[in-house]
């Protein structure tokens, strides 16, 4: 599991940062890639990575401002040229379906695969797919805006080899059933419960994506215990009044959420073009004083999210 940042800027593209998009790579888990927001030129950014559009199966849109959606029509069109691609689902606020369909209609673009739309309105579970759940809640922005929490199911514990050795169980169907936590009957009539031969479950990973918003209480439960929190940081920590007026957040506000909600790593994202070089470093340093495990991400940065308990 890995995050790759395709656009980390705010409002408009700059030479240093494209507008918003981040890819959640679930290649080992699902052989899929999920995108969160698709700002203008996202598909150009993808050309500079190893991402293949045929692997993109879900797109989550936080809100309908142009710097988060203007890349959608072109990306969807290009995906049609990738051969035999499967269906794609777009999750987003009311209006996202109209935006896509009108853009494709006016440009007379034909899509070779089904697109399903899930328009968001209420907080809660919006997606469940083979061991992953995605939850959403409203944020506080000028227009309807949503944050996302991706939760991986727990994994079975490790097989207790020493305990199995007591019963002289060889490799084969019986061992396979025990690994799956099933009950089995031995030749002598002994009943073994696979759950007794597995260590504690390994908790799944949690990724939280927060785009445009003021500091608001709904972020807390979306971010709770996240392995990685990607949080907008449009303003510096000493500009909270300006951030509030423009319906955005500061680096320090993001760091306070990370500390409060037991987050493991904070990625500052959605960086205004006013912050370059030393000024960008200032945002990161301000946040680190509150939450040390903070990084300010740049376009094409990759963040690995290892299994809990992994030494990687």
Swiss-Prot record:
EC class of the enzyme, as a word: hydrolase
Matching Gene3D superfamilies: Ribonuclease Z/Hydroxyacylglutathione hydrolase-like (3.60.15.10)
Its EC number(s): 3.1.26.11
Cofactor note: Binds 2 Zn(2+) ions.
Family matches, as CDD domains: RNaseZ_ZiPD-like_MBL-fold
Catalytic reaction(s) noted: Endonucleolytic cleavage of RNA, removing extra 3' nucleotides from tRNA precursor, generating 3' termini of tRNAs. A 3'-hydroxy group is left at the tRNA terminus and a 5'-phosphoryl group is left at the trailer molecule
GO molecular function: 3'-tRNA processing endoribonuclease activity; zinc ion binding
Positions contributing to Zn(2+) 2 binding: 67-68, 212, 270
Active-site residues annotated for this sequence: 67 (proton acceptor)
Keywords of the record: Endonuclease, Hydrolase, Metal-binding, Nuclease, tRNA processing, Zinc
Subunit structure: Homodimer.
Family under the similarity heading: Belongs to the RNase Z family.
Described purpose of this protein according to its UniProt entry: Zinc phosphodiesterase, which displays some tRNA 3'-processing endonuclease activity. Probably involved in tRNA maturation, by removing a 3'-trailer from precursor tRNA.
Name this protein carries in UniProt: Ribonuclease Z
């Amino acid at each position: 599991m890995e995050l790759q940042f395709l656009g980390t800027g705010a409002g408009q593209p700059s030479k240093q940062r494209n507008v918003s998009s981040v890819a959640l790579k679930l290649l080992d888990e699902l052989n899929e890639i999920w995108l969160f927001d698709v700002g203008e030129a996202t598909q150009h950014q993808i050309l500079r990575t190893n991402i293949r559009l045929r692997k993109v199966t879900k797109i989550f849109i936080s809100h309908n401002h142009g710097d988060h959606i203007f890349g959608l029509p072109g990306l969807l069109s290009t995906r049609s040229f990738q051969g035999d691609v499967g269906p794609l689902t777009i999750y987003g606020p009311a209006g996202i379906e109209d935006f896509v369909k009108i853009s494709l209609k006016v440009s007379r673009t034909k899509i070779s695969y089904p697109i399903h739309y899930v328009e968001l309105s209420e907080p809660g579970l919006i997606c469940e797919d083979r061991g992953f759940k995605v939850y959403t809640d409203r944020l506080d922005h000028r227009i309807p805006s949503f944050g996302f929490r991706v939760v991986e199911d727990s994994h079975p514990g490790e097989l207790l080899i020493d305990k199995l050795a007591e019963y002289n169980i060889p490799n084969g169907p019986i061992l396979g059933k025990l690994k799956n936590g099933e009950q089995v009957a031995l030749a002598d009539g002994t009943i073994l419960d696979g759950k007794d031969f597995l260590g504690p479950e390994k908790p799944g990973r949690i990724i939280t994506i927060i785009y445009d918003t003021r500091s608001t209480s709904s972020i807390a439960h979306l971010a709770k215990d996240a392995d990685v929190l990607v949080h907008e940081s449009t303003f510096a920590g000493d500009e909270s009044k300006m951030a509030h007026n423009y319906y955005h957040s500061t680096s320090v506000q993001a760091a306070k959420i990370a500390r409060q909600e037991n987050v493991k790593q904070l990625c500052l994202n959605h960086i205004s073009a006013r912050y370059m070089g030393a000024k960008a470093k200032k945002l990161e340093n301000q946040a680190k004083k509150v939450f040390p495990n903070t990084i300010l991400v740049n376009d094409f940065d990759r963040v690995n999210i290892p299994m809990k308990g992994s030494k990687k």
